[in-house]
Every structure is written in C-alpha cells, then in structure tokens.
Amino acid sequence: ISLLLTASLAAALLTGCGGKASEGGAAAKKTMVIGDTTFNSENWEETVDPHRTYNGWACIRYGIGETLVRYTDSMELEPWLAKSWSNDGDRTWTIVLQDDVTFSSGRKMDAAAVKQCLEHLLENHDRAPSDTKIVDVAADGQVLTVTTSEPNPALMNYLGDPYGCIIDVDASDFENGIVAGTGPYVVKELVTDDHLTLTPNTQYWNGTPKLDELTIRTLSNGDTLSAALQAGDIDAAYGMAYE
C-alpha cells in the first residue's frame, strides 16, 4: 500500500494537481507545500539518499529518483528506467535500460552509471545485499548483466523497492545526502527535520514537471499536520494518522 501511495503522490507532482499559482497572470509561479510527518531523522528519513536506511521513500515519493521497475495498481511490475528484463532461469539477469535518460546532474543514465549505483547500494545499505543476492554487475552500453549468488526470482521486485532509486553517485552533493536522480524534481535545499525544497528537473525524460517549486515541511505529529492543512498553511498532507 505504501508503494502505491508513493507512486500516486509522485504522479500528482508531475501533473501539478493541488498546487497553487501566485499572482501574475500567465506567468504565475505554480507552487505546492506538503506537510509530512514521516520525513524526519526519527523515522530514518533524514535525507533523500536511498542508500541510507529508509531515505529512499522520500527520494521516490517527491519525484527525485526513479527505480528500474515500478508497481502498477494491481501490484504487477512494469518498466520504468528499465525497458525490459529477462532471466536465464538460473542466476543471470539481463536488464535493458531506457535510452535518452539523463540524471539531474547532466550525466547520461547508461549501464555503467547504473552499475556504479547498484554497487554503492550493495556496499552501504543494510537490506539490499540479502534481498537481491547480487554478486556481480556488468555493463555494456544500455545493457546490464546481473548475477546473483543463487536463483532469486524476486530480484526485480526488490529493485523496485525505494532503495533501488537509480542515482548518480558521482554527483557533487551526494555525500551530503542530496542526490541527483532521474525524476522530475531536483533538490534546491535540504534542512533535516525542517524542510526540503525542490525545483523542476529541466532535463526530465518522461514529461514536463508542472510545479515551479515544491516544499516539504516536516511536521511533528498528526495533530499538527491536520491543523496546518485546515488553516491553509499547507496544500497537502502525507503521514496523517488513520482514524
């Protein structure tokens, strides 16, 4: 369910649903403020680096990064950054990447960049090695060849987890938790436990981002979130308590 909610929110950000326009007629700036009770260090979402704890949820939720595959409403896998994939029936997977995708850093998303990303993920994430069982990644143009330690029919499902967001690990701000992904938005400012400000990725490969600026405000609890929404201080809410 969380994956579907995240995907729905990311789609809304691409279309600009719920945003508001500032004064100025045709040139009005379209902005959105989202209150979020989950985007905080206490919840292990202190940055948007998917290779750290559970930060991948914020990375994908707010349109910064994308995964090789994603889940449909019926929880089936469909292509995203990968065009196709196949398995030899044993330990070897062949993944063909989309063409003409560029990271927000300006780097082309080719197999070499994805190999580097996956290797960094396996070195730094606590769950990815045991989930994926990847022992080798080879790159050739837009084709990845992935080898696992044992047959793993669920490999592509795991690569659709938010920790599988494909990012440019050579980007300048990477070590500060600010990543360059392939999504429709780029991090402008990140202040942990306070706010995240995003602007459009002008090189986005799959449509035109509809918001000129997106701000995520970290709010402490559901009551604060609900009050802010009712007061009009935020345009949307994420992490509201179920009652």
Which residues does each PLM region occupy?
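Short, well-ordered beta-strand elements
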Residues: 28-39, 92-96, 114-117, 144-146, ...
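Ligand-site clamp/hinge motif
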Residues: 203-243
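Short, low-complexity disordered leader/linker segments with a strong preference
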Residues: 1-32, 39, 44-46, 76, ...
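Aromatic- and charge-enriched surface segment that lines or borders ligand/interaction sites
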Residues: 83-125, 228
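Gly/Pro-rich hinge or "lid" segments in bacterial periplasmic/extracellular proteins
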Residues: 54, 159-209, 213, 223
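Surface-exposed binding/hinge segments that line
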Residues: 86, 129-169
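N-terminal lobe/hinge region of extracytoplasmic solute-binding protein
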Residues: 35-88, 180-181
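Short, solvent-exposed loop/turn elements at domain surfaces
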Residues: 28, 40-51, 75-78, 154-157, ...
